[in-house]
Design a protein with these regions (language model features):
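Short, conserved, GDST-rich strand-edge loop motifs in beta-rich repeat architectures
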Residues: 63-77, 160-190, 242-260, 300-302, ...
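Beta-strand-rich domains and repeat architectures in extracellular enzymes and scaffolds
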Residues: 33-78
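Asp-box/WD-like beta-propeller blade repeats and closely related beta-sheet repeat scaffolds
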Residues: 99-192, 206-222
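Conserved blade-ending motifs and adjacent loop-strand segments that build the rim/top face
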Residues: 281-283, 322-334, 366-391
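Surface-exposed loop and turn segments in beta-propeller and other repeat-based domains
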Residues: 33-43, 93-102, 201-224, 368-382
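Blade-loop segments of beta-propeller domains
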Residues: 47-49, 67, 73-123
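Loop/turn-rich, solvent-exposed surfaces of beta-rich toroidal or solenoidal domains
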Residues: 305-306, 323-368
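Blade-terminus and WD-like Trp-Asp/Gly-His loop motifs, strongest in beta-propeller folds
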Residues: 50-60, 100-118, 122-123, 148-156, ...
Length: 419
């Protein structure tokens, strides 16, 4: 890690936000503390922005793997484990899973309505499923749909087709035929977003890929594929944000699938009221809800430059381009629990190989650096890369991230003191 300290990179006051009152002070953020160690690699057990701490903040959910620089194949397991923060970071293995990747791990979530209980994706009896596990008793419940997002109350999930995703975006899909990928169907009318009741196990197809064909980028390649990915509920679980993509020339791309075209959408939780977030050419990449109506999304502003945007659902034409140029990169944006700050980490540039990380004060768009983290050559492969993928603890007193700056893929925490 490059120790940049808390150097103000930019202070950009919008005319509408200037006033005589003092802005909210930036918090003090500690240096990173490793809570896992080699020789094996470790990462948070879920995608960025997802809470990894138990209700009492004692345990942190992680994955452990022997694989370093390639995608996992069908039948190659990672260990789901808990780090005990009150017992010298003791690692407690609790399960195995063969549906995982280095980006979203196994999409593990703690369930707030059940004590000592987590869910994660796995392959059981040849099918991709969700496993609900009480890690202390070992009791399991199987939901026959893998999760892509879970509501804040833990009662609902969105499910997508991870077998199709393995073909169209390998670093986010799962190996094996645990779902019907429908490889020869460009616009499936029987697949898309599934709303899953995590208590009953019942699911309903709320939005099909085919239903959005006229609003997505069209394909000339007869072997192209359209698909949905990257879903997230708003805090009250009344709306869903998701990305819809088309991808062509799959057979010619033996090393990297990169020619996808993205359209960002929101819809109500029943699949109605579908809204495009941006005009043609803007795409969309990373995202998070600030509240029930406000989203941050990294997108290609005015089809010119990738940057961070904020907008209100229903008022998409009033979208703001924030950061005065400093935030013109594709970052993993997430909001602090108090809603006053936004964290975002980006990708390294050629010949530099350091991942930047910044904290934005939303009231005046002042920005400070949280450091720059070196990426060794072994972790520069697209499919096995190590993004920082931060996430706040629910009380805002810690932020965690994955990193390879000390030579191997490990999990780190930073303490936060709010002023």
């Amino acid at each position: 890690m490059k120790k940049l300290g808390f150097i103000a990179l930019c202070v950009a006051f919008l005319a509408s936000s200037c006033n005589s009152s003092a802005p909210t002070p930036f918090p003090e953020v500690s240096e990173p503390i490793a809570i896992t160690q080699g020789p094996k690699d470790h990462l948070f057990a879920s995608y960025y922005g997802i809470n990894s701490w138990s209700k009492d903040n004692r345990y942190v959910a992680v994955l452990e793997t022997d694989i370093t620089d390639r995608l996992s194949e069908d039948g190659e397991y990672a260990t789901l484990a808990l780090v005990d923060l009150q017992d010298n970071n003791k690692l407690i293995p609790i399960a195995k899973t063969c549906t995982w990747n280095f980006q979203e791990a196994a999409m593990c979530h703690w369930l707030p309505w059940a004590e000592d209980t987590l869910l994660f994706n796995d392959k059981r009896e040849g099918k991709f499923v969700t496993v609900i596990l009480n890690w202390k008793t070992g009791e399991e419940k199987i939901i026959p749909y893998p999760v892509s997002a879970v509501s804040k109350d833990g009662e609902w999930a969105v499910s997508i087709n991870y077998a199709r995703l393995r073909i169209s975006r390998p670093d986010y899909g799962y190996a094996g035929d645990g779902q019907d990928a429908q490889r020869d169907v460009a616009w499936p009318d029987n697949d898309g977003l599934w709303l899953v009741n995590l208590k009953s196990g019942e699911a309903k197809l709320i939005l099909t890929v085919a239903s959005l064909k006229d609003q997505m980028t069209q394909m000339e390649d007869p072997k192209g594929m359209a698909y949905f990915c990257h879903t997230v509920f708003n805090p009250s679980a009344t709306k869903i944000f998701f990305l819809a993509r088309t991808v062509e020339n799959l057979d010619a791309q033996t090393k990297k699938v990169s020619k996808w075209k993205t359209t960002s959408f929101t819809c109500d939780v029943d699949g109605s009221n579908v809204r495009r977030c941006f005009p043609d050419g803007w795409g969309g990449s990373h995202f998070n809800w600030k509240d029930d109506e406000t989203l941050a999304v990294t997108a290609k502003w005015e089809d010119r430059v990738y940057g961070h945007t904020i907008f209100t659902v229903g008022e998409e034409e009033k979208v703001q381009h924030i950061g005065a140029g400093i935030l013109d990169f594709d970052g993993h944006c997430l909001f602090s629990p108090n809603g006053k700050f936004m964290s975002s980490d980006g990708y390294y540039k050629k010949k530099v190989f350091e991942r930047p990380w910044v904290l934005v004060r939303l009231e005046d768009q002042a920005i400070i650096s949280l450091g720059a983290f070196y990426v060794p050559e072994v972790y520069r492969n697209t499919y096995s890369r190590c993004d920082l993928h931060p996430r706040f603890r629910t009380d805002g007193k810690q932020i965690g991230f994955n990193s390879v700056h000390e030579g191997s893929r490990q999990v780190y925490l930073r303490n936060i003191e709010w002023k």
